[in-house]
Amino acid sequence: MSVITSNPWSMVLAIFVINVFYVTFLTMRTILTLKGYRYMAAAVSFLEVLVYVVGLGMVMSSLDQIQNIFAYAFGFSIGILVGMKIEEKLALGYTVVNVTSSEYEIDLPNELRNLGYGVTHYAAHGRDGSRMVMQILTPRRYERKLMETVRNLDEKAFIIAYEPRAIHGGFWTKGVRTRKVKAYEVEEIESVVEHDDEVQSK
């Protein structure tokens, strides 16, 4: 500790690193709490307080020089970005994607089910006529892959994605076959769809 406090640049680095860790845990804990992951939030809060007790006391007592203040502020902002990035990579939970399509020639609901997604579809009416609306459940980490798949199948589809607060009842989560969703590549979607159509026709 004395080595760090005796060297001003070591102190700047220590303040930056400690604050990055502290705010990363703080950001993750806040996001997990809002998403309802109470036990994970509690575990992260333990690490957050541990960093606070061990390091932040030393940091706060050293904010009497301009370089330390800048290091503290920069570490705070980087910590928020790192925390959000980690949570994004973890991609916990599910996403619901609503797709409105006028494409009836391709059986989009069954094609998406064959790719591993849970799909509920129904008829609707828009300004320009009949539409098919699909409510698709996907693990959050595959949200972008699903949206690219839908655009490849119907480039004019209207897509809205949102994260449900809670899922209860039904068979949605069981209807999502994660292995199948993970297995296919978006670039090969046309060949995958053609293969599934051939199998079904037989």
From Swiss-Prot:
GO CC, alphabetical: plasma membrane
InterPro entries, alphabetized: DUF2179, DUF5698, UPF0316
Entry's localization field: Cell membrane
Membrane topology value: Multi-pass membrane protein
CDD domains with a match to the protein in the record: YitT_C_like_1
Family per similarity comment: Belongs to the UPF0316 family.
Keywords annotated in UniProt: Cell membrane, Membrane, Transmembrane, Transmembrane helix
Main location: membrane
Keyword Cell membrane listed: yes
Transmembrane segment boundaries: 8-28, 40-60, 66-86
HAMAP family: UPF0316
Protein known as: UPF0316 protein SH1041
Organism: Staphylococcus haemolyticus (strain JCSC1435)
